[in-house]
């Protein structure tokens, strides 16, 4: 029983990371009906932005929670700006083109960020500094959690709650809901659709960057291709929960994290990545719209 509870704790921790990344996928899809396959690479850039921010604030030499928070916020801000540039330069010109054009553009942006990362950061892995010394906290006999895992959980919950409050209780959030329902109607009501789309990309990029920094706190080795598999798994999590549905992305991320850790612990680490695609196949066969998604019939 203690082994199961320990794996559950580990799974929820990883699931919260997948949920943060999946939120970016689901928000962009909800607004644009676009799968932003470059989103996993924003997660990678967030980790590198955090690395350079930690050097700027000398967080490695004098670690503290305040400096760790500064590193996180700086990474989120810089990644949000990168997300804005990507939307303006890459996606906006093809917004009215066929969906295949946008999909090819997304793949191209992903390859550009990955190979650009190799040129800028180098192909060799970099090591993220230990901003917060690791401590282990016993929850139950045989069940423990590190303070870094708690930080991941708490920060993820705070960011998800803040996003929910933003979407439900601010003018911009309500405008995002309106745009997701109907671009033309929202525009006729005086909402700047371009502005809302840009804000959506910025928020999604900031959340992915936060996930990158949080993972780097636990697994300090970072490299330019680190976003490929987490990005794909987060996409599966978004589909699992119902892509375009914000609560669904959170639930899908948690399910993905728990399933991955359980398979690793009880079967073999060999199947750790495979479980994501098994879940994708199952959900597409059983419930294509996802757990919280609604089937929509397109008119021809």
Regions found by a protein language model. Give the residues of each.
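Short loop segments and helix-boundary regions at transmembrane helix junctions
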Residues: 30-38, 81-124, 166-173, 178, ...
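Inter-helical junctions in multi-pass inner-membrane proteins, predominant
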Residues: 2-17, 166-171, 197-237, 260-273
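Generic alpha-helical transmembrane segments of integral inner-membrane proteins
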Residues: 20, 24, 69, 73-85, ...
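Helix-loop-helix "hairpin" substructures at the membrane interface of multi-pass membrane proteins
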Residues: 143-222, 246-252
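Single transmembrane alpha-helix segments in multi-pass membrane proteins
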Residues: 4-53, 85-101, 240-246
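Alpha-helical transmembrane segments within multi-pass membrane transporters and channels
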Residues: 61-109, 116, 251-256, 260, ...
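Glycine-rich helix-loop "coupling/hinge" segments at transmembrane-helix boundaries
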Residues: 40-42, 219-246, 252, 276, ...
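Transmembrane helix-bundle core of multi-pass membrane transporters
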Residues: 93-94, 99-169, 196, 220, ...
């Amino acid at each position: 029983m203690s082994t199961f509870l320990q794996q559950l704790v580990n799974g929820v921790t990883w699931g919260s990371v997948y949920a943060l990344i999946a939120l970016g996928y689901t928000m962009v899809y909800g607004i644009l009906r676009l799968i932003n396959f470059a989103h996993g690479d924003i997660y990678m850039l967030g980790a590198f932005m955090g690395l350079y921010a930690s050097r700027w604030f000398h967080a490695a030499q004098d670690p503290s929670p305040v400096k760790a928070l500064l590193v996180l916020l700086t990474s989120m801000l810089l990644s949000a700006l990168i997300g804005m540039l990507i939307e303006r330069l890459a996606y906006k010109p093809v917004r009215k083109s066929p969906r295949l054009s946008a999909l090819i553009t997304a793949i191209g942006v992903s390859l550009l960020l990955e190979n650009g990362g190799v040129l800028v950061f180098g192909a060799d892995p970099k090591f993220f500094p230990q901003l917060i010394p690791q401590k282990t906290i016993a929850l139950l006999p045989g069940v423990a959690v590190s303070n870094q895992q708690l930080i991941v959980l708490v920060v993820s919950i705070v960011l998800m709650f803040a996003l929910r409050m933003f979407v439900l209780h601010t003018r911009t959030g309500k405008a995002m809901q309106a745009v997701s329902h109907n671009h033309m109607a929202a525009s006729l009501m005086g909402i700047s659709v371009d502005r809302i789309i840009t804000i959506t990309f910025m928020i999604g990029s900031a959340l992915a960057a936060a996930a990158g920094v949080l993972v780097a706190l636990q697994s300090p080795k970072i490299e330019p291709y680190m976003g490929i598999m987490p990005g794909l798994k987060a996409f599966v999590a978004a589909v699992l929960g119902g892509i375009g549905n914000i609560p669904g992305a959170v639930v899908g991320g948690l399910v993905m994290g728990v399933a991955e850790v359980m398979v690793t612990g009880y079967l073999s680490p060999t199947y750790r990545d495979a479980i994501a695609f098994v879940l994708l196949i199952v959900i597409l066969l059983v419930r294509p719209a996802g757990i919280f998604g609604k089937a929509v019939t397109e008119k021809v």
